[in-house]
Structure formats: C-alpha cells, structure tokens
C-alpha cells in the first residue's frame, strides 16, 4: 500500500516547505498542489543551484514524477507558461508530466488590476497582498461568475463569459477605484493563444489521484503559504484567500480526506512574517536583525524583507490542532547558532493580565502580549549536522521543549538549505 502525505506550513509561510517537499519527492510518483496561486514561492537548492517555483509543484525537478495542479489552485495562464518555459530552458521536461484540473479558477489581467487598485485605495490600511490577482480570482469563484481552465476548451463560450465578467469588473475599476479599464480584446486574444499550449495538460485530477492511490503509489500533497494565513483559521483579515490547512487538501484536489495518512508541519525554529498583520513575538532589536540577516529573510515571490521574532508555541500548537498534524519538520535551526539565549512564547496575556488563547480577529490580536520562557543558547554550529547526537546539547534541549509545548514530535530537522543537510528521525512514508 502506498502512503499519502500532506506537507503544510505551521506559521505565516516561508517555513522552508520547498526543500522538504523536494527531499520527500524522492519517495513518491505523484505530487499535487491544492490551493493558492503564483503568490507562493518555493525555493529549492539542489547541488548548489537555486530554483524558485511559484505554481508548478516542486516534484517537477524529479524525472518520473507526475505533478498535478488541483481545482483549489487559482491559475494564471501567463505565469504558468512563463514557469514552464523557464524550466524547459533548463532542459527539465514539463508538459508530459504536468496535469491541470479543468476546474482551476483562472487569474486574468483584470484580477491583477483589481488587486493592485484595492491595495492602493487602502493606503496605510493595506493588507499586504502580492498584487497578483489571487484574492479577486477566488472572489469570482465564490460568487460563481469566475472563468475556469475548462472554459478555455470552448472558445465561443469563453468569449461570451469573459465579456460579461469584464463589463462587471471594468465598471468597478473605473467608477469606484478611478483606475483604467482593462481591454477585453487583448485579454481574450492572449487567453486563447495560451489555451493552445495548456489544453494537452488538462485532465481529471481527482480521478488520476485516486487511480494512483488504488495502484499503491505514494502521493505527496504540497501546501503553499502557512496555516496562520488560512482564510478561516488565520489572522483575519491579514490572511490569504484560500484554505492553507489540511482540510484544503481534500477540497482542493478531490482526494478523499480519510485517504490521507500523514500530515507534516514544516516549522521554522523561530518565526517570520511578510507584510502587515498580527505578530506577537516580533523583535525590533538586534536579535531580530540577526535572525533576518543570518536567515536571509526575504520573500521568494515579492523580495520583501520578512519580519522576524521568537518561536510562538501558542500559534504553532493551534496549527497542530487544526491540521491534525502527525509530526513536525524543524527548519533553520542553524539561524539560532551563536545566540546566548533563545526564547519561546508559551502563552498570551491581554492588557488586563488575563491568560487568553488565539483571537479570532485582528483587533483581538492587538491586545496580546507574549509570555516568554528563556532557554540557554549555543555557540557551536549546527550547519550540516547529520544526526541529533551531532547537535549541541542546548539545541537538543530547545527541540525537546518545542515538542512538549506543541504536542507532536520533530520527525525531521533541516540543518541547511541543501537537501543533504537534513536529519530524518522518522520518514512520513515509513
């Protein structure tokens, strides 16, 4: 029997999922994306060579692996083809191994225009989107006016639907946001041109995944962003527009939830966040600067500097619960090397000094103060360590304390950016 494993971020994204997905892909024949869009950035370092993927699953770099983009992913045809061409320029075969769900909502130029016009109008109150049209595309999906990849199989139908939806959005762009209208004919011509290249890759993704399961294949589901950015369970409204948690795996791929065997939570040894939104353990001091510089904390998609802070065990425990996580992968432990003291947030208090849990809205987060526990740091390097025994005792104590606080074991430890710099204590596919 094969195993079906989900890889998710437990924080606000940028936890290092790309490397771990790439590592685990050596044990699978199928990899699937199930939510998000090209707002996600997966950075892989293989034999010292850096590759950044935004839409295509990381498994594409492994020959013999079939990659799927499920119905929960919002698809920008131009961004996808750009990524395909870039991989093909590196002599990576893509088209015969990449399968696309016809139910993927399309991101088209008017979605991008709306996204950027909205952020501009919000001014200092902006949410901090990537400006790539993700939110507006999901809105169209929920309002049932959105165009889907399968519509491109029928040119006349696509043209009629496109005209109708563009009249609606251009009215908002010009009359409310004071922006320029998006040209209908230009959008139509480009979409139909791209459709010719995309059509051969369109398949029933749900059916293909179940056939693979029935054949006893190992399947990996690759999450994007992080659990604290989930549209329902994250720090609303400073969240993404999709379900980044384990429940999104089933709805975003058509794969039955009871067929999932293991949920791996990728967790940074400290905390980072890109853009606006609550961040109780944020450090605006030398330690925060140390984490940012040593951790190279710049977004793979936007290049924006990430905010940094101590490990938040309260938030991660919340992520463990809502995802029913089986085990954790701890990344970037080496960034803490050299610190005399490391802190962990073990609780929240409000301004009245009362113990509180995870708030459900941004206003509730504003009244949060972290409660810290301090542990000794370590001066020795953890970079490239191949076993737990090779880690400094203080680092091992830190890991053990994190396990106790969040309620699951650390099954994998990443000790550097290359996939060989990894300690596997328990394989999700074992």
Curated annotation (Swiss-Prot):
**SMART domains xref list:** Adenylsucc_synt
SUPFAM superfamilies with a match to the protein in the record: P-loop containing nucleoside triphosphate hydrolases
So, what pathway does this thing act in? Purine metabolism; AMP biosynthesis via de novo pathway; AMP from IMP: step 1/2
Quote the Gene3D superfamilies the UniProt record gives: Adenylosuccinate Synthetase, subunit A, domain 1, Adenylosuccinate Synthetase, subunit A, domain 2, Adenylosuccinate Synthetase, subunit A, domain 3
Q: How is the cofactor bound?
A: Binds 1 Mg(2+) ion per subunit.
Q: What GO biological process term is on the record, naming one? A: 'de novo' AMP biosynthetic process
Give the GO molecular function terms. adenylosuccinate synthase activity; GTP binding; magnesium ion binding
Role description: Plays an important role in the de novo pathway of purine nucleotide biosynthesis. Catalyzes the first committed step in the biosynthesis of AMP from IMP.
Name assigned to this protein: Adenylosuccinate synthetase
Q: The organism's lineage? A: Bacteria, Pseudomonadati, Pseudomonadota, Gammaproteobacteria, Cellvibrionales
């Amino acid at each position: 029997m094969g195993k079906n494993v989900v890889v998710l971020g437990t924080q606000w994204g940028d936890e290092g999922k790309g490397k771990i997905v790439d590592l685990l892909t050596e044990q699978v024949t199928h990899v699937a994306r199930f939510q998000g869009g090209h707002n996600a950035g997966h950075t892989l370092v293989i034999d010292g060579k850096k590759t950044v993927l935004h839409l295509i699953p990381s498994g594409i770099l492994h020959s013999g692996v079939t990659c799927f983009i499920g119905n929960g992913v919002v698809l920008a045809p131009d961004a996808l083809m750009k990524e395909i061409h870039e991989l093909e320029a590196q002599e990576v075969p893509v088209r015969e191994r990449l399968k696309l769900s016809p139910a993927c909502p399309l991101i088209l130029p008017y979605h991008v225009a709306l996204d950027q016009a909205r952020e501009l109008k919000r001014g200092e109150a902006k949410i901090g989107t990537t400006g790539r049209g993700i939110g507006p595309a999901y809105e169209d999906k929920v309002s049932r006016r959105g165009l889907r990849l399968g519509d491109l199989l029928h040119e006349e139908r696509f043209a009629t639907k496109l005209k109708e939806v563009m009249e609606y959005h251009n009215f908002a762009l010009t009359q409310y946001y004071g922006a320029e209208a998006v040209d209908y004919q230009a959008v139509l011509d480009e979409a139909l041109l791209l459709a010719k290249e995309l059509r051969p890759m369109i398949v029933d993704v749900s059916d293909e995944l179940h056939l693979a399961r029935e054949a006893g294949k190992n399947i990996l589901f690759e999450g994007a962003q992080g659990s604290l950015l989930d549209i329902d369970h994250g720090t609303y409204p400073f969240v993404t527009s999709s379900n980044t948690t384990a429940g999104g795996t089933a709805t975003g791929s058509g794969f039955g939830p009871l067929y999932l065997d293991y949920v791996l939570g990728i967790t940074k040894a400290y905390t980072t966040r890109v853009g606006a939104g609550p961040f109780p353990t944020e450090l605006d001091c030398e330690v925060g600067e140390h984490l940012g510089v040593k951790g190279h904390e710049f977004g793979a998609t936007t290049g924006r500097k990430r905010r940094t802070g101590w490990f938040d065990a309260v938030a991660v425990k919340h992520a463990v619960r809502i995802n029913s996580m089986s085990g954790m992968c701890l990344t970037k432990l080496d960034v803490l090397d050299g610190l005399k003291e490391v802190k962990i947030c073990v609780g929240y208090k409000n301004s009245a000094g009362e113990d509180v849990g995870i708030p459900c809205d941004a206003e509730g987060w504003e009244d949060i103060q972290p409660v810290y526990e301090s542990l000794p740091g370590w001066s020795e390097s953890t970079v490239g360590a191949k076993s737990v025994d090779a880690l400094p005792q203080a680092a091992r104590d830190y890991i053990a304390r994190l396990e106790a606080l969040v309620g699951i074991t650390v099954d994998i430890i990443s000790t550097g950016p290359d996939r060989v710099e990894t300690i596997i204590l328990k394989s999700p596919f074992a």
